[in-house]
Design a protein with these regions (language model features):
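Flexible, low-complexity segments enriched for small/polar residues
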Residues: 6-24, 29-40, 267-298, 307-509
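Exposed alpha-helical structural elements
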Residues: 27, 43, 52-56, 60, ...
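Generic alpha-helical secondary-structure signal
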Residues: 31, 47, 59-60, 161, ...
């Protein structure tokens, strides 16, 4: 983990808007792009009028906690014979068909469900499984359901349930872990990746002894891809010593001992990952320590840690805004939600699933057991052009479907703070600069500080045939004047979006 080198010195005290540090569009997008997958124009306007970030965070988290899990598909508990019979009846219904269907459902949930699904995606990259290893689409569906159930719940319960889930048992060879041939894979990853961190608070002896305590989850009643159950005859029924505690430990004991004996290490490791994902890749150890204490105080409930973080001065510090490179899901789904794209002629869910896969983020199927590393991995040269053109595809589809919606989006857009108001149709002539500034601040997390780049963006917005340069002059008068109520503003906004896609700051959130 990188030491804290950031300039963000703010604390976890609650952020309260003030004239010196107002609640504005930038902070609203910062919250929604981190805690969810972007905000619609209506949601931004509502958040701005509320002027109470703490209450907004509580509402978003409360909604996530109250949300029902996604209903399982008809095939969510099929075994291998069921899938083979379905494929025999229809050649198109092979395993990849069901996997795509499950992933499309996740993408649809990411679009709609904000906080719960943001955490579901986060945990899928923490408790990693790969569908090409366990193969069963039903296991994938059950795993996804488990992520949703525990996304904001109790982390100790999460660790318990994930370790004996069908997908994880197969993925990390728990289903091969028997008394005379203990398999150490899951025991190692339980500590190294899921709870403690690499070489942090455990020994090789702890791994070996833990693997014995985890034996026995191997029984499928001879049903391929059926539920994997505990078989006491395959359990290592002997004394084991884990973290200095000796006894004839089994699965339940491992979890209890881990959280009793390594409480602070577990809390710190998980909170450091939450911090890196939601605030900055550069760790602030003092802030993480406070988050960890909140985690412990609340008996490893996840939601209180999130409430504390997302309400804090630290989270809304300018150094935290625009500090993270967008993942493919961030890039595509946030833009989709923020622009309010609605194209009845396109299967948006399938398009987004396939696009983020091509860009390196195949949902429910990270690249390896350590998951997607993110950050600069997302913008390697071979992926960057694909990121640009995928966003352009969305822009062009929206334009071809309803160009008028482009002007409608601009009209009424908030300028910055509630006191500054919204873009209204009375704007004309040189007031075009107000529109450009509002759009730049809306789509770039920290605006554009480089004057040359900003002027280029402004030039692109202004440079259309309908509005010669004289239309923007202070002495311009009707009909030879730019006005926000003109239909050609749609073309200006289209040109603006097409241009900003290539600007490096657009890749940040």
């Amino acid at each position: 983990m990188v030491s804290d080198t950031s300039c963000n010195l703010d604390s976890l005290d609650m952020y309260v808007p003030s004239p010196e540090n107002p609640w504005n569009v930038s902070k609203i997008h910062h919250l929604y792009r981190r805690i969810g997958f972007g905000a619609s124009k209506a949601e931004v306007l509502n958040a701005l009028s509320l002027n109470n970030p703490g209450a907004l965070v509580d509402t978003l988290i409360d909604e996530a906690l109250a949300l029902n899990t996604t209903s399982p598909p008809a095939w969510g508990f099929w075994n291998r014979d069921d899938f083979e019979a379905a494929e025999m009846a229809n050649d198109d219904n092979d395993l990849s068909f069901y996997r795509r269907e499950g992933k499309n459902q996740m993408i649809n949930d990411l679009i709609q469900n904000k906080v719960r699904e943001r955490l579901t995606l986060f945990w899928s990259n923490h408790f990693v499984t790969e569908d090409r290893t366990y193969r069963s689409p039903a296991y994938q569906s059950q795993y996804y359901n488990l992520l949703q159930i525990h996304a904001l719940g109790n982390f100790r319960d999460f660790v318990y349930d994930i370790g004996i889930s069908n997908a994880m048992l197969v993925y990390l060879n728990g289903d091969e872990n028997v008394k005379n041939r203990p398999n150490e894979n899951y025991a190692r990853e339980l500590y190294e990746l899921f709870t403690l961190g690499v070489d942090n608070g455990y020994t090789e002896d702890d791994i070996q002894e833990t693997s014995k305590a985890l034996t026995g989850y191997v029984n499928t009643n001879r049903i391929p891809w059926g539920d994997i159950l505990f078989n006491p005859e395959q359990f290592s029924n002997e004394n084991k010593t884990i973290f200095g505690q000796s006894g004839n430990w089994g699965y339940d004991d491992v979890i209890n001992i881990l959280f009793q004996e390594r409480e602070t290490l577990v809390a710190t490791f998980i909170c450091s990952k939450l911090y890196a994902y939601f605030v900055s890749p550069t760790c602030n150890e003092a802030i993480v320590a406070q988050m960890a204490q909140t985690f412990i105080t609340n008996n490893f409930q996840i939601a209180p840690v999130l409430r504390q973080l997302f309400k804090s001065e630290h989270f809304y510090n300018q150094e935290a805004i625009g500090a993270i490179i967008k993942s493919p899901c961030d890039l595509m789904i946030c833009f989709y939600n923020e622009l309010g794209i609605n194209d009845p002629m396109m299967d948006s869910t399938d398009f987004l699933r396939n696009t983020v896969r091509v860009l390196g983020q195949d949902v429910l199927n990270p690249i390896d057991v350590e998951g997607w590393q993110g950050d600069e991995d997302w913008i390697s040269p071979d992926l960057l052009i694909g990121r640009w053109e995928s966003i352009r595809f969305l822009i062009n589809r929206a334009w071809s479907e309803n160009p008028e919606e482009f002007r409608n989006f601009v009209v009424g857009l908030p300028i910055g703070t509630a006191a500054e108001g919204n873009l209204d149709t009375s704007l004309s002539g040189p007031q075009v600069d107000i529109v450009v500034r509002a759009l730049v601040n809306y789509f770039f997390p920290r605006g554009i500080e480089d004057e040359v780049i900003y002027n280029e963006i402004s030039g692109v917005f202004k440079d259309i045939d309908a509005f010669p340069p004289t239309y923007y002059e202070p002495d311009a008068v009707d009909p030879a004047i730019w006005r926000l109520d003109r239909s050609e503003v749609a073309e200006q906004f289209y040109a603006f979006l097409d241009y900003i896609v290539d600007i490096p700051e657009f890749q940040l959130k």
